[in-house]
């Protein structure tokens, strides 16, 4: 499991701020080698939040529009990890209401 440090969280709504942190940690759980250290900052930019994810050698930024629904932060971070080749979790499929869905 990767190590995650939330260095700053500026989201003004306490419940949403806590959910953002949980979803980021959950998404990064399967990223890279088990000792990979990720540092994150969640910045409030008024109409959206910006999530900075830092790893030695690079920094990526995600924009999450407010209000962010449950799971939106997790999906955005997972998509970023997939794009960077850092997502080690195998995607599984299941049927939900007659259509294929993923665990993501």
Where are these regions (language model features)?
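C-terminal partner/receptor-binding element of secreted or periplasmic proteins
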Residues: 89-93
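Negatively charged, low-complexity tracts enriched in Asp/Glu with abundant Ser/Thr
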Residues: 1-39, 73-79, 95-104
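Short secondary-structure boundary motifs at beta->alpha junctions and helix caps
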Residues: 59-80
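A structural detector for beta-sheet-dominated domains
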Residues: 7, 43, 54, 65-67, ...
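Long protein-protein interaction modules used by eukaryotic assembly/scaffold proteins
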Residues: 74, 86-87
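Short, intrinsically disordered low-complexity segments
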Residues: 38-63
């Amino acid at each position: 499991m990767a190590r995650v440090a939330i260095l700053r969280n500026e989201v003004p709504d306490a419940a949403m701020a806590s959910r953002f942190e949980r979803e980021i940690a959950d998404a990064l759980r399967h990223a890279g080698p088990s000792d990979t250290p990720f540092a994150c900052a969640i910045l409030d930019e008024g109409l959206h939040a910006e999530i900075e994810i830092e790893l030695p050698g690079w920094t990526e930024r995600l924009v999450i529009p407010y209000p962010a629904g449950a799971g939106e932060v997790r999906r955005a971070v997972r998509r970023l990890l997939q794009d960077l080749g850092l997502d080690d979790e195998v995607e599984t499929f299941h049927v939900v209401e007659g259509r294929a869905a993923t665990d993501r």
